[in-house]
Design a protein with these regions (language model features):
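Gly/Ser/Thr-rich loop/hinge elements
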Residues: 288-393, 436-442, 451-472
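N-terminal signal peptide c-region/cleavage motif recognized by signal peptidases
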Residues: 18-20
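C-terminal soluble interaction/assembly domains
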Residues: 397, 405, 409-411, 415, ...
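Flexible, low-complexity junctional segments that flank or bridge functional domains
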Residues: 23-322, 326-333, 394-396, 426, ...
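Long, C-terminal catalytic modules of enzymes
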Residues: 408, 460-464, 469, 475-492
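Bacterial N-terminal signal peptides that target proteins for export
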Residues: 1-8
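Extended amphipathic secondary-structure runs
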Residues: 199-206, 365-422, 426
Length: 492
């Protein structure tokens, strides 16, 4: 989960890091942080001791991946490249909940130090030219398909340049999200910059183009990225009327998105939302890394359908397996302390405090007995209350690869409700190793985040997301909002 620092905290973090860097070079800092990441995960992550297929990648990468990453550390020469190498190691676990996040202001998704004036998008299994900077001569046209770069097949070129460093290319969502960077120089010394030549399929012809570096202006880079990947605008929570039916925008699940005002808007229009004309719930770009993301999504569902109707349709929690270590216990003890220090939380959430107290007690018992793990029951399923469905029309839930973590938890509920159709494109995936521990790494340049418990009985499998059914998959340009809306209209 990305942690945002205040300006003063960011300055302090950079000052501390700069003090370290004056005595050590960035390569040494990277080696130090890689080893600390390895040691923390090996000592505390559930996958190290929980059996099953979900743990296999963790176990095969924890040591081998460290050696792989350490072999690249000599190329680290800046804070940005330090972040790239730590991200490479973290992404190698193929676990969306293992992450390293810079404590300084990281590079924007629109950032590049050089580019050929061209951006690509991942469309229907191919890298396709999605943007050409106005005035650039000798560039491939929009729609051309990239076949090779620097004489490498494009699949190999993309894997070497993007996988691990920019995202996990084993997922469709990461291929979409990282595709604009295929031909860019993002200041990562461990991969090539702008390729010298690339071959494109233009209509029926294969043609080679020289990739001539162009000035990388912020405005052009942002325009290029937005032409390639759906990117929500400034207002991420709202309701508008499209083709005579409500279109509910939930393009963020972050805490600062403005939930009180949005929920008030939902409640004021509830009769319309439940009408026979149907409605659209737009979850594109709904990054769900916040601790409260799932509760935000459930809060929307409960307002539209009522808690009495949704409660029996929530997925069964099953059992949770905890890794019994002192560090994991400390996380819960600290959390309990914060809960008990908040008078409002004490008044409103006594059952949560009781549950957390029981978990801390279970940690104590397991540690005293020398157990590596212990199991706690999750929320039991609830019998059907008999409440009627208040929503009269069809509900289309629109998703894409920006739907992550808590957004997927929300879909676990929404897809169980009647007359709901999932449409759009594949979501991201998430692992069964959940609820993040966050710790500062020795350099002060980065935080490590990892799930400290295993939801081994989750009904949606490990690293599984959602893919709309045939006929409900959008194959057009996802950044053409008029086309997307016209297509959604055909689903009613």
């Amino acid at each position: 989960m990305q942690r945002l620092l205040t300006a003063s905290a960011a300055v302090l973090a950079l000052a501390l890091a700069a003090g370290n860097a004056s005595a050590q070079n960035f390569s040494d800092l990277a080696r130090q942080d890689l080893q600390a990441t390895h040691d923390a995960l090996k000592a505390n992550h559930p996958a190290a001791v929980v059996p099953g297929a979900a743990s296999e990648t963790f176990r095969s990468w924890i040591d081998a991946g460290l050696q792989d990453a350490l072999s690249k550390a000599g190329q680290v020469n800046s804070g940005e490249s330090h972040a790239y190498l730590l991200r490479y190691y973290a992404n190698g676990f193929r676990d969306s909940n293992i992450a390293t996040n810079p404590t300084f202001e990281a590079a924007s998704p629109f950032f590049a130090t050089g580019w050929p004036g061209v951006a690509t998008a991942w469309r229907n299994g191919e890298y396709v030219v999605s943007y050409v900077q106005p005035g650039v001569r000798g560039a491939p046209p929009v729609g051309a398909v990239v076949k090779t770069c620097n004489l490498q097949p494009i699949a190999d070129f993309a894997k070497a340049k993007l996988d691990g460093f920019e995202g996990d290319l084993t997922t469709e969502a990461a291929r979409v999200r990282t595709a604009p960077y295929l031909l860019w120089n993002r200041n990562n010394p461990m991969v090539g910059g702008v390729p010298s030549t690339c071959e494109f399929q233009v209509g029926r012809r294969a043609r080679e183009y020289k990739m001539s570096p162009q000035p990388a202006t912020a405005a052009n880079l942002e325009a290029a990225y937005r032409a390639s990947v759906f990117t929500p605008g400034a207002t991420k929570l709202s309701i508008e009327q499209v083709d005579g039916r409500p279109w509910v925008h939930v393009n963020s699940l972050e805490d600062n998105a403005g939930w009180d005002a949005f929920y008030a808007q939902v409640e004021s229009q509830i009769a319309t939302l439940r009408g026979a004309q149907g409605l659209v719930i737009d979850l594109r770009g709904a990054e769900g890394g916040s601790v409260n993301a799932t509760s935000r999504g459930y809060g929307l569902a409960n307002r539209i359908w009522t808690p009495e109707f949704t409660v029996s349709r929530q997925p069964e929690a099953g059992q949770i397996t905890y890794r019994a270590t002192a560090a994991n216990r400390q996380w819960f003890a600290d959390t309990l302390n914060r809960m008990q220090s908040d008078p409002r939380f004490v008044q409103e959430s006594a059952p949560v405090i009781e549950q957390t107290q029981a978990i801390v007690a279970a940690f104590d018992a397991a540690l005293a007995a020398g157990q590596q793990t212990f199991v706690m029951p999750g929320r039991p399923s609830v019998a059907d209350t008999g409440a009627a469905n208040p929503v009269q029309g069809k509900v289309v839930v629109l998703v894409d690869g920006g739907c992550t973590n808590g957004c997927l938890d929300t879909l676990d509920l929404l897809t169980r409700l009647p007359n709901v159709q999932l449409a759009g494109s594949a979501t991201d995936v998430d692992s069964i190793f959940i609820e993040p521990t966050v710790q500062r790494l020795p350099s002060n340049y980065s935080d490590l985040s990892y799930g400290h418990k295993a939801w081994t009985t989750r009904q949606r499998g490990n690293n599984q997301g959602y893919v709309p059914a045939q006929g409900l998959t959008y194959t057009g340009n996802p950044t053409d909002e008029a086309a997307v809306r016209a297509w959604v209209g055909t689903l009613f």
